[in-house]
Amino acid sequence: MKPMHIAMALLSAAMFFVLAGVFMGVQLELDGTKLVVDTASDVRWQWVFIGTAVVFFFQLLRPAFQKGLKSVSGPKFILPAIDGSTVKQKLFLVALLVLAVAWPFMVSRGTVDIATLTMIYIILGLGLNVVVGLSGLLVLGYGGFYAIGAYTFALLNHYYGLGFWTCLPIAGLMAAAAGFLLGFPVLRLRGDYLAIVTLGFGEIVRILLLNNTEITGGPNGISQIPKPTLFGLEFSRTAREGGWDTFSNFFGLKYDPSDRVIFLYLVALLLVVLSLFVINRLLRMPLGRAWEALREDEIACRSLGLSPRRIKLTAFTISAAFAGFAGTLFAARQGFVSPESFTFAESAFVLAIVVLGGMGSQFAVILAAILLVVSRELMRDFNEYSMLMLGGLMVLMMIWRPQGLLPMTRPQLKLKNGAAKGEQA
């Protein structure tokens, strides 16, 4: 152990102790008209000391960690991709699908509800992966399309009484239209400028929903959004006025409130499977190759006779449609929508799913969505520090595997050693 490593560990621990002591060790209290600085509870100081110790030992043992991670990180370490190209992978995917269908009947109602939320984020991640991972366009306002889909279902049901299955394609079309219209002003923008424009779009949508109280309800939102039905059969104790019948009464079963949660999960699973099927089919079409060409080099893409303008428009439109479908499912799960559900934090969370999983890989998006959504739900008890913990996890992930958990495998052509030597000679 070199003295320099010990000194760096002590310095890092001291800096952490000072910063954590300021943000967590003290608290402001209102005494009449004055703010009084007071020390925090002993529990918070315990966490400060624990964090200081963790930082010290991490910095002290960091060289050993780096040596150990070299074998399992970096571009040379590529986890096997699962794209269904072989018979074994197809059998594995079928087994996963069967397990996913049977799983909700063996767990609790709350677990199934969390799984449904995970499915929603998987659809969002797959949609954003089209424009960010496959096309190489940075979008920070994806929550705007998400909100359009959710409010389309909520408004059509509130004012016209339309159901889930009727509103699902309409919400997708509305979000796709918004993506198509957004594509025109951002066609010539790239990089940070494109990200800023899309960020502004997401905030504009949220503010419009917040201020238009006569139609959207403003901050109060829209409530009493119905759940999806099975060919008109409702998963409730009694059918609504004008409804056909309930699921339990039609089949002569005992009413179980878990049936509604399980059915919503199966609907979400169906939408995930359809999303994967559509995206994989698009990737095998010339459109998918055009997305990859745009991501690699826009100038080379134009020189090949491809139109970057049309490619961007298709990417924005298709990506927004998936967000609209996810928004409809979110509104059905919650039974209530409000503008506060579609802040920039939601867009950042979906972007984190795509980046941490591995841009361009569908299976990576699924894995990252499961890890991040479940981690966020488990950290509900640390509500004040959940985003801090999530940010720390992202930083560690970027240090360990900046290319993501399962980066997309790209075809490569390499010359053999003999051929390369012959050309050099």
From Swiss-Prot:
One Gene Ontology MF term: branched-chain amino acid transmembrane transporter activity
Assigned keywords, A-Z: Amino-acid transport, Cell inner membrane, Cell membrane, Membrane, Transmembrane, Transmembrane helix, Transport
Keyword Amino-acid biosynthesis among record annotations: no
Highest taxon listed in the record's lineage: Bacteria
Its membrane topology: Multi-pass membrane protein
CDD domains found in the cross-reference section: TM_PBP1_LivM_like
InterPro entries: ABC_transp_permease, LivHM_N, LivM-like
GO biological process terms on file: branched-chain amino acid transport; isoleucine transmembrane transport; L-valine transmembrane transport; phenylalanine transport
Pfam families in alphabetical order: BPD_transp_2, DUF3382
Record flagged with keyword Transport: yes
Transmembrane spans: 6-26, 45-65, 92-112, 120-140, 145-165, 167-187, 191-211, 260-280, 311-331, 353-373, 387-407
Principal localisation: membrane
Entry-linked NCBIfam families: PRK11301.1 (NF008450)
Chain's role: Part of the binding-protein-dependent transport system for branched-chain amino acids. Probably responsible for the translocation of the substrates across the membrane.
Protein family: Belongs to the binding-protein-dependent transport system permease family. LivHM subfamily.
Name of the protein in question: High-affinity branched-chain amino acid transport system permease protein LivM
Organism this protein belongs to: Escherichia coli (strain K12)
The encoding gene: livM
